[in-house]
Amino acid sequence: MADRPIRVRYAPSPTGHLHIGNARTALFNYLFARHNNGTLVLRIEDTDTKRNVADGEKSQMENLHWLGIDWDEGPDKGGDFGPYRQSERKDIYDKLIKQLVDKGFAYESYRTEEELKADREAQKARHEMPHYEYEYEGMTDAEKADAIAAAKAKGLEPVIRFHIPMDKTYEWDDIVKGKISIDANTLGGDFVIQKRDGMPTYNFAVVVDDHMMQISHVLRGDDHIANTPKQLAIYDAFGWEPPIFGHMTLIINGATGKKLSKRDETVLQFIEQYRELGYLPDAMFNFITLLGWSPVGEDEIFTKKEFIKQFDPKRLSKSPARFDQKKLEWVNNQYIKAKQKTNPNELMSLSLANLIEDGKIHSDPDPKTIEWARQLISLYTDQMSYTAQISKLADIFFDKATDLTDDERKELADDNAKPVIEAFAKKIRALDTFDAYSIGGIVNEVKQETKVKGRKLYMPIRIAATLRMHGPQLAETIELMGRDQVLKNVDLVTGQL
């Protein structure tokens, strides 16, 4: 195994959008491949036709590309070990299943779903673990042949079951969990490797594909631990060398401590949703990488190259990874602030699209509006956790208040508030150049004239000018709001004092 080239795979089913957990699996395999100058294979496991959705494969690929994950072989790129869709490999599976049947490792099973259900109920009544009961137990070869002939005469379609060796322990050195041992007697008996419709099951197809595609390492979620002994049994039957396995811990909701489930609506769980909200791909790459993997040192922000250089599966956590929404927002904010410095046009484009989608700006804005939006976005960059947040953050420019809140009235109840506002309004009306620099100047003039400073100066001016107690830099906010709107706001406030 040590001499084998590093080849890993990400093998999604096209059953929907890219989930956070699956994105993490893809990302860790990508980092492992790139760190070792290895190969990443994208394989589409689409044998469960009932669960496949239209454009599911396309959606997976688009979101992987958006995250910055590229692969070396796959259905869109080809390679020496294709086809890379399981639905196109049925002839391969059929041939190998026949080999197992011919050698006695597998057999036709005609037990109906009703019979299997009755078996499970009887086992439950006996306080036994659910398991498949061998239907040909105690039969001679002739009796077995007669039973099969009778089933066929009834028009029953068989499944193919793999004969799991009992009283055997399957062990492997897991690169995440360490040594794992599972007793074959706990596996539920002989398991299906080919369904009645002729399609292979997951546990069979994945073994065949991993072997034929020369996969050296399998990094996947620890919900697959129970599948591993079944897969090892198939490797043994063929005499194939299995890959090295590594099973990553599950992801839990940091707020509830429960396993992250697709039914948990308190957390957005699909990459597509974060794209639509204006999360940046590099930020998502960074955050997801730290879900269950620890870098050297205390830093939390890394470039992709730094992650590739550091990545070692031995640093994958043995404890569940906590999905912390606030932490994700913090990480994305760091990238937004960096993007404002390195590529402000990209950030502008994303945020402008959100403003248009929310109906805050016309769908075909003129150059003056675009420049105004550019200044607005720059004003809120430090506060923005994701670009779709811009409409809510900047609501003072779009949602006009018509009355003061109780808290605002309390702030303006001070004897100094009215003279400060009146002095400010007078100077705003007379201001020749209405820009942030000049506005900052008249605020200082009001300070000198009224002898009021600090909160008692700035809070009345902010409330009067913007109808809000809080916001970004005051002078810049007033400039973007415009003289006419500011004076309307001032008149509204003074009318309520």
Swiss-Prot record:
One of its GO terms (cellular component) is cytosol. It comes from Lacticaseibacillus paracasei (strain ATCC 334 / BCRC 17002 / CCUG 31169 / CIP 107868 / KCTC 3260 / NRRL B-441). Keywords: Aminoacyl-tRNA synthetase, ATP-binding, Cytoplasm, Ligase, Nucleotide-binding, Protein biosynthesis. It is found in: Cytoplasm. It catalyses: tRNA(Glu) + L-glutamate + ATP = L-glutamyl-tRNA(Glu) + AMP + diphosphate. Its main location: cytoplasm. InterPro entries: aa-tRNA-synth_I_cd-bd, aa-tRNA-synth_I_codon-bd_sub2, aa-tRNA-synth_I_CS, aa_tRNA-synth_I_cd-bd_sf, Glu-tRNA-ligase_bac/mito, Glu/Gln-tRNA-synth, Glu/Gln-tRNA-synth_Ib_cat-dom, GluQ/Sye. The keyword Iron-sulfur does not apply. Its EC number is 6.1.1.17. A motif ('KMSKS' region) lies at residues 259-263. Monomer. ATP binds at K262. Pfam families: Anticodon_2 (PF19269), tRNA-synt_1c (PF00749). PROSITE patterns: AA_TRNA_LIGASE_I. This is Glutamate--tRNA ligase. Belongs to the class-I aminoacyl-tRNA synthetase family. Glutamate--tRNA ligase type 1 subfamily. CDD domains: GluRS_core. The keyword Lipoprotein does not apply. Catalyzes the attachment of glutamate to tRNA(Glu) in a two-step reaction: glutamate is first activated by ATP to form Glu-AMP and then transferred to the acceptor end of tRNA(Glu). A motif ('HIGH' region) lies at residues 12-22. GO terms for biological process: glutamyl-tRNA aminoacylation. GO terms for molecular function: ATP binding; glutamate-tRNA ligase activity; tRNA binding; zinc ion binding. SUPFAM superfamilies: An anticodon-binding domain of class I aminoacyl-tRNA synthetases (SSF48163), Nucleotidylyl transferase (SSF52374). NCBIfam families: gltX_bact.
